[in-house]
């Protein structure tokens, strides 16, 4: 059938096209049927939503579809039913526990990107990976397919370094120090980062406090070839586009298949042209990987996958049992990171981790002798060279290179929790800290978050401040206070834990 495009000023939350009920009956189309829209220039796929938002002879295009494909109001398109793609058969094959061939994986990924697969079919694929897993042949094929269906970056400055943390630790502003340290040593490090999904601040959220983070690949290439580094939001790029689609299914199902996680991370490194990749795997209670044994197994997978992609990969297993530094939330973390770069010093957990990771990269890149990377990284930080490189990054990304930490605005609604008793800090709950910061409005409210005054092992007296919540509104502050009282994020105990009498 022929139909005129009507642009709908709405997001449907899915990749849908809207057809009038009478029109759908005539065309024998049903809800969720896959259709293709053909014009002289392109073919676009979408799932049918039957709605009287559009009239007979019209097809409604939501903003979800417009984000990827250009349509004009009133443009005439041909609407045709589309049968189930071949990739559905391959998904069923994986559901049955069978190994997928390279061409089958490539077909699935291409159909995900082209939107030939509907949400339910993508969810089935993700579930099959969670239940039946992928071997390394399949993971490598999936990684390359995810990268090659998107844009690829080609930077002339070599070698190209990269670092990625699998996350889970609140306050992880480490890479805001690592990137300028590594670039100040003469290595190239184009860092793409994510925004927060379940955390209180992704690296991109923090960097955005003092610089722009959304750039095209051409703009990134220009910045990196000029100054050797960038810190940008990966979501603004068409890198491994299948990943963004499958992540939605993972979130909805609350699952994270290991093979898909490996492919998700490494496909973007492959697309960025990274030659040397350092993976940071934090371990500890309340993070994604809780034991060192789990971390070692995952490390072996990353290293093996890197070999198959032609990348040299090393893994750092790091302590993730409590927040890094003293702040959680975009603006608060930006202040702390900038202060550390300006002064060359800062909280021990932040400086130790940042110089440790940067040192490994300096050794991997051949600018520091084996075993001397951390010392060199600390010297670069303390000399002010890393801060000068950070100023260049901020300026090239459209920010003010002269900005001072105290000039970064933070929430003006605050509440401080104090120690209810004297004793020692025996635990800080990562998930609770993140939950409080998010309840306060982070990451959407840049000035929201938490400032911690204590760390595990420290002694406190009754009435000593433990942490302050920052919010941009009274309502958000009240919400965070209620959450904090319920969550009890900091545990204080005396040296005598329990007294037991005669039994």
UniProtKB/Swiss-Prot annotation:
Entry keywords, A to Z: Glycosyltransferase, Transferase
GO terms for MF: 1,4-alpha-oligoglucan phosphorylase activity; AMP binding; pentosyltransferase activity
Residue positions of the active site: 256 (proton donor)
Residue positions binding AMP: 168, 194-199, 203, 264, 288
UniProt record, GO biological process: AMP catabolic process; pyrimidine deoxyribonucleoside metabolic process; pyrimidine nucleobase metabolic process
Record-listed E.C. numbers: 2.4.2.57
Catalytic activity: AMP + phosphate = alpha-D-ribose 1,5-bisphosphate + adenine; CMP + phosphate = cytosine + alpha-D-ribose 1,5-bisphosphate; UMP + phosphate = alpha-D-ribose 1,5-bisphosphate + uracil
Uppermost EC category: transferase
One cellular component term from this protein's GO annotations in UniProt: cytosol
Similarity remark: Belongs to the thymidine/pyrimidine-nucleoside phosphorylase family. Type 2 subfamily.
Functional summary from the UniProt entry: Catalyzes the conversion of AMP and phosphate to adenine and ribose 1,5-bisphosphate (R15P). Exhibits phosphorylase activity toward CMP and UMP in addition to AMP. Functions in an archaeal AMP degradation pathway, together with R15P isomerase and RubisCO.
Protein name: AMP phosphorylase
Species assigned in the record: Thermococcus onnurineus (strain NA1)
């Amino acid at each position: 059938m022929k139909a005129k495009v009507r642009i709908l000023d709405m997001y449907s939350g899915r990749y849908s096209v809207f057809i009038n009920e009478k029109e759908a009956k005539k065309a024998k189309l049903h809800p969720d049927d896959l259709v293709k829209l053909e014009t002289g220039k392109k073919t676009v796929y979408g799932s049918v939503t039957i709605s009287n938002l559009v009239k007979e002879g019209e097809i409604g295009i939501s903003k979800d579809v417009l984000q990827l494909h250009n349509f004009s109001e009133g443009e005439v398109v041909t609407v045709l039913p589309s049968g189930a793609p071949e990739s559905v058969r391959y998904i069923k094959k994986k559901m049955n526990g069978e190994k997928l061939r390279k061409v089958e994986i490539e077909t699935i990924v291409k159909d995900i990107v082209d939107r030939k697969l509907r949400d339910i079919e993508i969810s089935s694929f993700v579930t099959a990976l969670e239940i039946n897993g992928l071997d390394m042949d399949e993971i490598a094929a999936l990684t390359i397919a995810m990268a090659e269906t998107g844009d690829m970056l080609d930077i002339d400055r070599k070698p190209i370094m990269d670092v990625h943390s699998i996350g889970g630790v609140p306050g992880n502003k480490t890479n805001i120090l690592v990137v300028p340290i590594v670039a100040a040593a003469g290595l190239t490090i184009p860092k793409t980062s994510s925004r927060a999904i379940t955390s209180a601040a992704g690296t991109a959220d923090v960097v955005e406090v003092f610089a722009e983070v959304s750039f095209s690949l051409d703009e990134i290439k220009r910045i990196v070839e000029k100054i050797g580094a960038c810190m940008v939001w990966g979501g603004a790029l068409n890198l491994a586009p299948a990943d963004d689609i499958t992540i939605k299914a993972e979130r909805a199902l609350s699952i994270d298949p290991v093979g898909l996680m490996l492919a998700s991370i490494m496909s973007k490194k492959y697309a960025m042209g990274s030659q040397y990749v350092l993976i940071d795997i934090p371990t500890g209670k309340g993070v994604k990987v809780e034991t060192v044994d789990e971390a070692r197994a995952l490390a072996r997978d990353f290293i093996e996958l890197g070999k198959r992609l032609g990348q040299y990969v090393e893994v750092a297993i790091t302590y993730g049992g409590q927040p890094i530094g003293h702040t959680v939330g975009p603006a608060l973390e930006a202040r702390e990171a900038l202060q550390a770069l300006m002064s060359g010093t800062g909280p021990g957990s932040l400086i130790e981790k940042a110089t440790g990771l940067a040192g490994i990269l300096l050794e991997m890149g051949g600018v520091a002798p084996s075993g001397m990377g951390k010392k060199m990284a600390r010297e670069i930080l303390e000399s002010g060279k890393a801060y000068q490189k950070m100023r260049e990054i901020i300026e090239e990304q459209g920010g003010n290179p002269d900005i001072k930490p105290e000039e970064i605005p933070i929430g003006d609604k605050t509440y401080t929790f104090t120690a209810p008793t004297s004793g020692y800090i025996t635990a800080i709950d990562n998930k609770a800290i993140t939950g409080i910061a998010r309840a306060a409005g982070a990451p959407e409210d840049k000035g929201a978050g938490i400032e911690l005054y204590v760390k595990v092992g420290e002694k406190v007296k009754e009435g000593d401040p433990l942490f302050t919540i920052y919010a941009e509104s009274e309502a958000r502050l009240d919400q965070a206070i209620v959450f904090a009282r319920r969550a009890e994020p900091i545990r204080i105990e005396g040296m005598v834990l329990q007294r037991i009498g005669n039994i």
